[in-house]
């Protein structure tokens, strides 16, 4: 879009992603308003950043594009009660994750364009890369193209975030939602956490010191993941010893075997057919009893107390811990 036809944007939510999106878009020349609850946890932050902050119902009224950047589980009610009744005819509705739309929890008005733009990095990185003249890759999708310009809206928004400086890849709401959930559950969060805890337990139960076990299965994981991030699995293998490489080749498949892969497929099936989302909605509506139980169990796992003591002596982590003190999750509007 040319400068004189750039959409007026309303950002609903001001958590990690919301703040980065709002700041980058404003610095890219867009007219950005932030919609938040009066007295909400991030209202003062948005105001301190120089934004006009109004109620979400007001923010969306004159916006050409409304970006919903609040947690997944509040979006349905927010859309039905606040956004849908107030969005102007023919505007564009944008999501950073497709869960609610793909699984029909949000059914957008027929007159709206509906798109998705998701930077592939946390909000702090999205902002930092933009400020130094680079960008974080973005994926985008079009769910509903009423105006014939939905894709243009998505690409314009992604460009405003800095995504065009890096890479922009087209996807679908289905693909983004299902692969994102699978990655979180089977590998990045659920898979990695369970693997680390199991490895710690095996070593401690075999009589090794918990502190040594912590270093071997958790602390050093960052070194490996950083190499993955920089150049893939083969780069990691280039930087470890031949002994470690051989152990990778012969023991990795013993831990992650065909049975593990089959169970990963089961996880994917539950995501694809909506079982996971149905269960998650029911859990949330019930007040999170199992969620809280699982969370407490993780907090009480022996690796946490050991790690807390060891990290207290890692003085180089102090600045990182302070930066991480703010909630990583996006805040409700």
From Swiss-Prot:
- Specify the KARI N-terminal Rossmann domain's residue ranges: 1-171
Give the cofactor note: Binds 2 magnesium ions per subunit.
GO terms for biological process? Answer: isoleucine biosynthetic process; L-valine biosynthetic process
Catalytic residues, chain numbering: 97
Positions of substrate binding: 241
Give a Gene Ontology cellular component term annotated to this protein: cytosol
Cross-referenced Gene3D superfamilies, in alphabetical order? 6.10.240.10, NAD(P)-binding Rossmann-like Domain
Q: Which residues bind Mg(2+) 2?
A: 180, 216, 220
Would the keyword Ligase turn up in this protein's UniProt record? no
Cofactor(s) required, per the database record: Mg(2+)
- Keywords, sorted A to Z: Amino-acid biosynthesis, Branched-chain amino acid biosynthesis, Magnesium, Metal-binding, NADP, Oxidoreductase
Tell me what reaction this enzyme catalyses: (2R)-2,3-dihydroxy-3-methylbutanoate + NADP(+) = (2S)-2-acetolactate + NADPH + H(+); (2R,3R)-2,3-dihydroxy-3-methylpentanoate + NADP(+) = (S)-2-ethyl-2-hydroxy-3-oxobutanoate + NADPH + H(+)
- Family annotation (InterPro entries): 6-PGluconate_DH-like_C_sf, KARI, KARI_C, KARI_N, KARI_prok, NAD(P)-bd_dom_sf
Can you tell me which residues bind Mg(2+) 1?
180, 184
Family the UniProt entry places it in: Belongs to the ketol-acid reductoisomerase family.
Task: Quote the PANTHER family the UniProt record gives.
Answer: KETOL-ACID REDUCTOISOMERASE, MITOCHONDRIAL (PTHR21371:SF1)
What the protein does comes down to:
Involved in the biosynthesis of branched-chain amino acids (BCAA). Catalyzes an alkyl-migration followed by a ketol-acid reduction of (S)-2-acetolactate (S2AL) to yield (R)-2,3-dihydroxy-isovalerate. In the isomerase reaction, S2AL is rearranged via a Mg-dependent methyl migration to produce 3-hydroxy-3-methyl-2-ketobutyrate (HMKB). In the reductase reaction, this 2-ketoacid undergoes a metal-dependent reduction by NADPH to yield (R)-2,3-dihydroxy-isovalerate.
Annotated protein name in UniProt: Ketol-acid reductoisomerase (NADP(+))
User: Which species expresses this protein natively?
Assistant: Xanthomonas euvesicatoria pv. vesicatoria (strain 85-10)
